[in-house]
Amino acid sequence: MTPQDFYRTLEKDGFLLSSKQKEQFDTYFKLLVEWNTKINLTAITEKNEVYLKHFYDSIAPILQGFLANEPIKLLDIGAGAGFPSLPMKILFPNLEVTIIDSLNKRISFLTLLAQELGLENVHFFHGRAEDFGQDKAFRGQFDVVTARAVARMQVLSELTIPFLKIGGKLIALKAQAADQELEEAKNALCLLFGKVIKNHSYQLPNGDSRFITIVEKKKETPNKYPRKAGLPNKKPL
């Protein structure tokens, strides 16, 4: 998917990018490739692949109608090189984006990237989701939490749901069907008062299958969740 293909595909979906937005995506690509030689951000560095498998894939929840261009408080867990939240932010500038990542070098990259792209209302924090999930400044504060290829739903639910307001939504982007994952996550979702409201499949323009699972938070998360760092992964609910 060349940049021009990317623009045309978005235009067909009703999103006409401004010259500023096109420049932002171009700068994003260049900085991603440059920084990838210093720290491991991605295995995908070929331009057409980045536009398809990172940029287009990241904004899929918007293209599929699951997010609006409003001042929604959005948290991205384990965003790595900023996916999916920063491409979303470029497309929908009104989003207020917070990223938590456990690697400080990635936070350094994201901070510089946001400055170079001229993004406002973006915040970056270094640390573990389990620790921030028990911090009152973060817990129960977000309308949406996004996670792209972070963990199985059984683990992911404990890392994300505590951050949501009641009625808030987890948007999980997956490369594989989540049916088996959701079956395994039933107990975790029950304990965390999360309900799967959508399990959506779609295709990238090259025909690759992708999946979006949306979980709504129904009640306050019990105080004991999330458990200490590492436990959700070692002993899933």
Swiss-Prot record:
One of its GO terms (molecular function) is rRNA (guanine-N7-)-methyltransferase activity. Keywords: Cytoplasm, Methyltransferase, rRNA processing, S-adenosyl-L-methionine, Transferase. S-adenosyl-L-methionine binds at G78, F83, A129, E130, R148. Pfam families: GidB. Gene3D superfamilies: Vaccinia Virus protein VP39. It is found in: Cytoplasm. Its main location: cytoplasm. Its EC number is 2.1.1.-. GO terms for cellular component: cytosol. InterPro entries: rRNA_ssu_MeTfrase_G (IPR003682), SAM-dependent_MTases_sf (IPR029063). Specifically methylates the N7 position of a guanine in 16S rRNA. Belongs to the methyltransferase superfamily. RNA methyltransferase RsmG family. This is Ribosomal RNA small subunit methyltransferase G.
